[in-house]
Amino acid sequence: MPKPTSHLFAYVRTVSDFRPDVTAIVIFGLEVTNDGPVYLLIRFEDYEELQIEGDHLFLGLDEALESAEFEYGILPSDWRVMTEAEIQRIDWNISSSDLSA
């Protein structure tokens, strides 16, 4: 099983009726000061171009993995650990976005 602050990627297996344009999912572990990690499930229309459809915050990794399996049919064996370059690319995108809007 991945480490508690995992950064995981998987392609969607099942097209969602509610979000048919989503093709890939990233679960991005974020450290919280004086608390455990949280997990941002990021839905991508185009992962290579970082075209994000939306996201959802989970307090636990298991909860995020279960949601991805339920919504998109992603199995535990479908996930891969992201490379450091991928992590930095996503981290920069999160850090540079206007989260207060």
Role assignments for model-derived ranges:
Residues 1-21:
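Negatively charged, low-complexity tracts enriched in Asp/Glu with abundant Ser/Thr
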Residues 22-52:
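Short aromatic-glycine-(Arg/Gly/Cys) micro-motifs in beta-strand/loop hairpins
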Residues 47-101:
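Mixed-charge, Lys/Arg-enriched low-complexity segments
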